[in-house]
Design a protein with these regions (language model features):
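N-terminal active-site segment of His-dependent metallophosphoesterases
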Residues: 1-57, 130-139
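His/Asp/Glu-rich metal-coordinating catalytic cores
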Residues: 33, 46-185
Length: 185
């Protein structure tokens, strides 16, 4: 949210998808749990109050009204500093929202009998803890906000640096935010 300098046009475009596609699909299939893989907010430093008001009244209230719950891990755009997850927009803006659980640290959750490892933005402060979590978390699925070497950040532009995909081979499925196009490995 807040893309293109808090553009109302972009916000309305996103909300059209949520209103016309996402929420109707969730309701039709009685889906009550959502996992967001980070970067809920576009900019790490600010969002304008008009867009923030609309996020609350048009998105968060819709979650609550329909008894839905969103598990939200932090992405790099959600944190103020690149080297820590401690100061983040999600906690500051939505920390009291009953419809959201925010994950600043790695954690395994269970949804309908499935253990899922959630891994927020990996930075210099939490790198060792994150690598240990990746290696030891007892879950077949990992959802993170990962910088992975050799993957397309956007179509045709490979990311140079980041973690090696080999580190995640023990998982049956790994899903990540951060990258702006769907990719298979």
């Amino acid at each position: 949210f807040g893309a293109r300098g808090d553009s109302q046009l972009f916000f309305d475009y996103f909300m059209k998808f949520f209103d016309d596609e996402l929420f109707p699909y969730l309701k039709e299939h009685n889906i009550k749990t959502i996992i967001h893989a980070g970067d809920m907010m576009d900019r790490r430093k600010f969002v304008n109050f008009n867009i923030l008001h609309q996020i609350r009244t048009r998105f968060m209230d819709e979650l609550e009204k329909n008894d839905m719950h969103m598990h939200c891990i932090l992405g790099n755009h959600d944190v103020y500093y690149r080297n820590t997850n401690k100061v983040n927009s999600m906690q500051e803006l939505f920390g009291n929202c009953k419809a959201i659980t925010i994950y600043e640290n790695p954690e395994v959750i269970n949804i309908d009998g499935l253990d899922i490892a959630l891994l927020p933005w990996v930075n210099s402060e939490n790198y060792d803890e994150s690598v240990d979590f990746i290696k030891t978390a007892s879950a077949p699925v990992l959802i993170g906000h990962l910088e992975l070497e050799g993957y397309d950040v956007i179509r045709g532009v490979k990311y140079d640096g980041g973690m090696k995909a080999k580190l995640f081979e023990r998982y049956e499925q790994v899903l990540t935010g951060h990258f702006h196009c769907r990719q298979e490995n």
